[in-house]
């Protein structure tokens, strides 16, 4: 059996995870001849906040129905396609994917490594669509970024058939302590309100980037702000400009984006945003 997934996705740099990353944008072309060939369908076309049209699910529905006997699971990033595209897609696509998986007897895996624990304004991005996956992958913010730690969550039905495996570094006590402390903060009153405040500031501060020549799109969801350029940026040059102005921002390809820590101050967030906009204005004048 194989995994099905959508294009423009990114799921990490370990061997099998690379096989479900987009073969073009996933940064793993060097391994393309050796990775397992998985089943890809188009990425969602309708953006978050757009007018929904069920035709956006047509290819996924057709593929899963026709190839259900060879598909073990559908894996995707819910709502936000991260390092592969920094795109925000319509929640109805995820809701429809859940329904199709149920119809075809296929497990749904949601990769919440980047989106989990409030990043999109909901505790988990799946909540935007009102669905629960059979398996959920979480990491990054589970420890607040202090220690490497990840977890795989499963429904009772999904867990029932799993062969138990105990990796060497499983349940590291120090990482578990950091995760418990981070989760205590996540469930406090005001945590998600802070994410929405970050969203409000990002929308206001990045608005002027829409007027910069060479900018294709500006989009914000929760504590994620993205400026998409029409052409790839000179990463070395633009990073030098950012550092020279006292901030660290990592652009890639045509994307310059912010995913600040939730504890960032309003002042620091405004500085990050204003430097991003000023640098893009400067480089656009020299093109």
Model-derived features: where do they sit?
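Conserved N-terminal phosphate-binding loop of PLP-dependent enzymes in the Aspartate aminotransferase
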Residues: 1-287
């Amino acid at each position: 059996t194989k995994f099905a997934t959508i294009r423009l996705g990114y799921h990490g740099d370990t061997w099998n995870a690379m096989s479900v990353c987009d073969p073009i944008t996933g940064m793993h072309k060097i391994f393309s001849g050796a990775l397992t060939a998985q089943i890809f369908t188009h990425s969602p076309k309708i953006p978050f906040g757009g007018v929904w049209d069920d035709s956006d699910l047509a290819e996924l529905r057709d593929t899963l129905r026709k190839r259900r006997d060879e598909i073990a699971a559908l894996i995707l990033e819910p709502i936000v396609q991260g390092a592969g595209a920094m795109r925000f897609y319509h929640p109805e696509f995820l809701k429809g994917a859940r329904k199709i998986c149920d119809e075809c007897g296929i497990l749904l895996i949601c990769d919440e490594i980047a989106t989990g624990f409030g990043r999109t304004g909901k505790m988990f991005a799946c909540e935007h669509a009102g669905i629960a996956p059979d398996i959920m992958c979480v990491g990054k913010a589970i420890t607040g970024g202090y220690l490497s730690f990840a977890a795989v969550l499963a429904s009772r039905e999904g867990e029932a058939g799993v062969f138990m495996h105990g990796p060497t570094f499983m349940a590291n006590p120090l990482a578990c302590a950091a995760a418990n402390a981070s989760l205590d903060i996540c469930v406090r009153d005001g945590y998600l309100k802070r994410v929405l405040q970050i969203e409000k500031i990002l929308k206001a501060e990045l608005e002027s980037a829409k007027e910069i020549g060479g900018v294709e799109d500006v989009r914000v969801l929760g504590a994620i702000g993205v400026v998409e350029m029409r052409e790839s940026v000179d990463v070395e040059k633009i990073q030098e400009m950012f550092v020279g102005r006292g901030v660290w921002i990592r652009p890639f390809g045509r994307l310059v984006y912010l995913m600040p820590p939730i504890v960032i101050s309003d002042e620091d967030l405004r500085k990050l945003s204003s430097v991003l906009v000023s640098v893009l204005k400067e480089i656009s004048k020299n093109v």
